[in-house]
Structures are given as structure tokens and as C-alpha cells.
């Protein structure tokens, strides 16, 4: 299902010239970068404790303790679900990208989706060769201790997509 979602997003992206027949360029890119499962959906929240309580008390979900991600300017909390996770994001520090998001969306909302890939460096190289915009093509260590990059929303139909190495 998520491979189809990404295929549809990439097919509709202005950054690609596409062939919708079998063996399409987009299908080949997806295969080349080794997209795996949906790792998490990230939600920016203006009130971290309130959001933690919501998922714990209303849905009975396992909720982690908050962790400050100094390098990324966010505090993260992971909500464990049966087949994926929700990452709650709250601003941390003076230069938090989440602060800007919350200025535009004061009550919070979906910030990004995260998909797993086999090899982050190979995925970056392949996507750059196909003119997909990557916010910073140098992988950084993400909240799970694994390398990540973010694909620019302008290349992904308005969706910020995080790729995380399996």
C-alpha cells in the first residue's frame, strides 16, 4: 500500500517525467531505492504533554518518555501502535523547525511521514540523479539512531518525506 502511495506521489510530482505504462520510470526508481515499510507519521504539537496523554489515555497506546533531539531542534515522543509509530514533535531550542510549522499551524498537525530504505546513501544518490530535491543530501542521525534525510515537499506533492535506513 505504501509503495503505491509513494509511486502515486512520485508519478504526480512535477520533478519527474513519467511513463505510466508497465516498467515505468517511477516504478524503477522505487525498486532501485528499496522502499520498505512506513516507519512513522510525525505530528507537530504545541502541547506535548496533552498529546502524550491523548494517545495514552484515549487509545491505550504505549508512549515513550520525551527525548530532546538537540541537533534537530525538537523534542520527540514515540507512540507505539500495532503496525507503526506516531512521532510527536515539539519545539526544542531557539532554531526549531517545528516552531515555524506551529506558527503556520497553531494547533499542530501532520509534519512528515517516514519510510524505511535499505541503504540511505544509495537512495540519496539515486534520487538526486532523478532530480528529486533533498533538503540536505548528507544523512544525519535521526531519533532512532539511524541515518535519515528529508525529501523536499516540492518534489513530493507537498508532503515532507523522511527516509530512514533500515
Curated annotation (Swiss-Prot):
Residues 1-23 form a transit peptide. It is found in: Mitochondrion. It holds the Pfam family Glyoxalase_4. Gene3D superfamilies: 2,3-Dihydroxybiphenyl 1,2-Dioxygenase, domain 1. Residues 37-166 form the VOC domain. Signal peptide: none annotated. Its EC number is 5.1.99.1. InterPro entries: Glyas_Bleomycin-R_OHBP_Dase (IPR029068), MeMalonyl-CoA_epimerase (IPR017515), MMCE/EMCE_epimerase (IPR051785), VOC (IPR037523). GO terms for cellular component: mitochondrion. It comes from the Eukaryota. Keywords: Cobalt, Isomerase, Metal-binding, Mitochondrion, Transit peptide. GO terms for biological process: L-methylmalonyl-CoA metabolic process. Co(2+) binds at residues 40, 112, 162. The keyword Kinase does not apply. PROSITE patterns: VOC. It catalyses: (R)-methylmalonyl-CoA = (S)-methylmalonyl-CoA. One of its GO terms (molecular function) is methylmalonyl-CoA epimerase activity. Methylmalonyl-CoA epimerase involved in propionyl-CoA metabolism. Belongs to the methylmalonyl-CoA epimerase family. This is Methylmalonyl-CoA epimerase, mitochondrial. It comes from Dictyostelium discoideum (Social amoeba). The lineage of its organism: Eukaryota, Amoebozoa, Evosea, Eumycetozoa, Dictyostelia.
